[in-house]
Amino acid sequence: MTIDELQKIVYNAGIVGAGGAGFPTHRKFSDKVEQIVVNAAECEPLMMVDHHLLEFHLAEIVEALNILCDTMNAKEVLIGIKGKNMHLLDEKVVRSLKGTRVKIKEIPDVYPAGDEVVLTYETTGKIIPEGAIPVMVGVMVINVETVFNIYKALKNASPVTEKYITIGGDIPEDITVVAPIGMKIKDLLTSVGYGNLDGKEVVNGGPMMGKLVDIENDTVTKTTKGLLIFPTTHGIIQRMKQPVNVSMKRASAACCNCTMCTDMCPRYLLGYNLEVHKTVRAASHGEVLNTESFLQNALCCGCGVCSVIACQQGLFPSKLSMEIKGALGKYGLRRENNVQPESVREVRASRLVSSNKLIDRLGIGKYVKPSVKKIDTVFNPDTIYIELKQHVGKPATATVKAGDKVKCGDVVALTAYEDLGTVMHASVNGTVKQVTDRFVIIGK
């Protein structure tokens, strides 16, 4: 198989990054890739999707990785997994990997171990240059579920029509489900018995980097990995609800210029010239001509360590940094003085944030269950809303119209292959009820 053939298979299957922003996976394949790094870190607390896939589908994942390795002529595959999760791996499969290109690489139980810059360093020892992507150092980083989707596309020509999701938080039993893409999140939670949300809010994603769910309108997408339920009064919810202008006002009133937000920043500790305290200072004091203090936020990964762990004043620097980063992207502003760090900072090892410390600081220890059950419920929603923008790049354009009959797996929208985007498929059998500028709506 050639790289071009692999790219077209993965594009046609609608595969995007399942654990992050949804970057179209076919665009990552390159003959410049020397090492494939699999993100099995399960970076944020309470998330369990990767656990289940590694426990029950490791053989399939390894098979797909070998195909990727052969196609790109990569030298090795490194599956980055925390030591505490090694017991999940099938011993027979692990033994079969000895002497092969696929290696299990133990990484520390710290946050954010799943950030691609951190993960690349922990697995390969390489530091990705500022403002660059992993392939610049010969690395491709890929999520566990994404690899599993590639396996299904290669073996069965199966497109992405469903999503593995952990449902957890302030509920009696955490579960992992496989839900059709486009199902209303409200309907999904109701179907598994967690539809009563009086006095509670739902987070799409982890407790650090997730977003609040609009429970009446939000749907399952290709990047939905976790739905966490917390009381409305919980600190996680209050942090996510705080408007960025309030964060700026609080910073101007309460920031003590201690620099702890910079000192604890995972990217700074890897040698990046990202000094969060300078952004807080410039924004709160209106230093609009201090351009570097704003442009440097292009290097921020939004992990939230500065907000949750570092700041002793209860400020949220990461909220400000990500707001600025979004504005930089919107207006096409780039930081031109990016450099290649020569080494990590000497203090890095002493400033890593353990998962246990993070759980304690977030106040979610009581929500950590001893096990998470995978349930095999087959969901049968009356209506599906296939969002046209579930990925990085251009939105997909509908290829169907109201009244068209579709089957699960049929193409309903796509972004042209030459553009950055992907293909959308029906996740149920039914009839197209409506096509809007945001959704293809399918009903029975």
Region roles according to the model:
Residues 75-187, 191-198, 206-207, 231:
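Hydrophobic alpha-helical positions that pack around
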Residues 38-50, 171:
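Gly-rich Lys/Arg/Thr-decorated short loops/hinges at beta-loop-alpha junctions or inter-strand turns
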Residues 396-405, 409:
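Short histidine-centered loop motifs in beta-beta connectors
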Residues 407-421, 439-441:
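Short hydrophobic beta/alpha edge segments that flank linear recognition/processing sites
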